[in-house]
Amino acid sequence: TLGAKIYNVGTSPNGLNINKNCGSTFPKKIKSLVKKHKVDLGISLDGDADRIILCDEKGKIIDGDQIIAMLANRWKRKKILKGGVIGTLMSNYGLQNYFREQKTKFLRANVGDRYVKESMQKNRFNLGGEQSGHIILGKFATTGDGLLVALEVLFSMRKGKKASDLLNVFKPMPQILENILVRDKNIINELRCKKAIRKANKLMGRNGRLLVRKSGTEPKIRIMGESHNKNLIIKCIKIIKQSIKY
């Protein structure tokens, strides 16, 4: 229907290679292929296709936050958007600022698509998602669906808009995410870690924000720092890392 020429990659499963060097968690693969084939858009899904990351024609990776911003604009124009948009604690602060400017209500849920869904239902919103690419289009489904999101983007591109123009909606605040492998995720509840987190937050002050949390899927502690001062983010994350890696 859309008349696109498609290059398929990572579509030969053998039961062991799910998400191996491909998909939404390995975006540099799609980036290299977009440049190689000089295509208009790269679409990268995870193994069960509930998560999506895109790559524009210039080779720039487009995360879930930018996709959500684009979808909110599209649905708002079409008078489809209900209530506002649900993001998470990981959503870039630039997205929040953008929605404030657009007078679009934006609320944050805990990290995880189940919490996004719960908040959407509670607030009667029909759009929500995560920076990682879990995006729920409440008009069509009650769970993340990367294929539906891809179709929404492709339909928007039918009018001749380039992906780079369509999907770079807002200027994100510099953000650094570090994942630390640990034996016990409860380490962040220990006194030395709590002290380090307090120290880092004091150093960050009003110049940005820090988020330290246990991974819900891996034996890792995730530390996210966000600020216009990149060196400050690095310093704050280092303080917390040193208390975890000993």
Residue ranges and their predicted role:
Residues T1-G160, L166, P172, E178:
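Phosphate-binding chemistry for phosphorylated carbohydrates and sugar-nucleotides
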Residues G160-Y246:
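Catalytic-core signal marking the mid-to-C-terminal active-site face
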